[in-house]
Amino acid sequence: PIDVLLRRVLDSECDPLELDSGALAGTPGLVQAVRGGRVALANPLGSALVESPGFMGYIPAVARRLLGEELLLPSPQSWWCGRPDGLSHVLARLDDLVVEPVVTIPGGPKRYVPRLLDAAGRTALVDRIRARPGDWVGREVIERSVAPCWDGGRVVAAPVVLRLFSAATPEGPI
């Protein structure tokens, strides 16, 4: 039997019986099993909100408000363009940032690195941001570390991103 699951599927695609009948990645009956208490989700439906780029800029304030303390590991700074100060900051520092939609929609725009765009691409991105500023977030660029990786029969240095999660237990975080 399974006690706890860690989802790697979009919320909307978790259960084709209850959520999206066209979803191929989900587990039929998952929502019913969760409702009935037969399985727990380590990252419950709806928890993707916390990983939303639009929410990232508010995580330090949420931690202070809910926990009364600062984050042990800082989040990358981000600025929501739906606020006038955020929009002006993002447009003024466009080449120093990564720009991404507040909510990632399958088939929709992903993230943009403005300094890598040609003039036409950059202008198009600025126009999209100005047209619907609340849909966009600017985030500081995270310089990635490199680690040895196996590629084509040889070891090469390649960029690596490591995402870690912690779980709260009665004995403390694990």
Name the predicted role of every residue range.
Residues 1-174:
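Domain-scale recognition of functional cores that engage charged ligands
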